[in-house]
Design a protein with these regions (language model features):
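N-terminal cap/leader regions of alpha/beta-hydrolase-fold enzymes
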Residues: 1-244
Length: 244
């Protein structure tokens, strides 16, 4: 049974809560950072952290929206509010939050600090991709990470995160995508893979037919049971290979 707790760390002089879930009685466990969607660290994200704990990992889900307050949990129906919160975060903010979470894990007696992975969903998938450039991260899993390449409807000249960061990727990546995701066309997924492989990076992508954005979240209308049930064991196998 997992032990669920909340810690607080300082980021730029502000407090950030980190929701943790770890194996009961475990000495040192490999760790996985679980990055939220644009809705905050809600019950879905906390349950994913607990699922990882039940598989033997110390899971840590930082509240990336802490600059707007603690415990932010935006309803799935309030997309405009969710995008507004995400829009407040700069690249430096994201990097600082991830590093603060890593530092917390490295100083935690229950964590094997040499084996830290990261997984993220939606906005968090992009954060997980960025995490793969951090030398403290040993493996990164991306679930429909938006923003690595511009959306099809993005304004001309929108920055291409992939171009700016691909050279720095150092951790192996596994990605899970839906072919019905309106914001992330399969052509983007293919370009991400082609670009990274051309630079000698390790990436393995899985694209699910009929699945849309948010297919892993049981609480969303976009939940796709087949895609969710196939991606989870693949995620566990990936982390077991690189973190255990």
């Amino acid at each position: 049974m997992a032990v669920n707790e909340t810690a607080e760390v300082s980021v730029g002089g502000e407090q950030m809560a980190i929701h943790t879930s770890r194996p009961d009685g475990a000495d040192k466990s490999p760790a996985i950072i679980v990055i939220q969607e644009i809705f905050g660290v809600n019950n879905n994200i906390k349950s994913i952290a607990e699922r990882f704990a039940n598989e033997g990992y110390f899971a840590a889900a930082p509240e990336m929206f802490h600059r707007s307050g603690s415990g932010i949990d935006i309803p799935f129906s309030e997309m405009e509010k969710a995008f507004a919160e995400r829009g407040k975060l700069s690249g430096d903010n994201i990097e600082d939050d991830v590093q603060a979470t890593i530092d917390y894990l490295k100083n935690n007696p229950n964590v094997d600090a040499s084996n830290i992975g990261i997984v993220g969903f939606c906005f968090g998938g992009m954060v997980s991709y960025l995490g793969s450039t951090n030398t403290d991260i040993s493996a990164a899993a991306i679930y429909y990470g938006g923003g690595i390449l511009p959306r099809p409807d993005a304004a001309e000249g929108t920055p291409r995160l992939l171009d700016a960061t691909a050279d720095a990727v150092q951790a192996p990546i596994i990605g899970f995508w839906g072919d019905q995701d309106g914001g992330i066309p399969v052509s983007n997924v293919e370009e991400i893979e082609k670009t990274l492989k051309a630079k000698g990076k390790s990436i393995e992508n899985h694209v699910y037919e009929g699945a849309g954005h948010g297919f892993f979240c049981e609480d969303r209308g976009s939940y796709n049971e087949a895609a969710a049930n196939d991606s989870w064991p693949k995620t566990l196998a990936f982390f077991a290979e690189h973190l255990k």
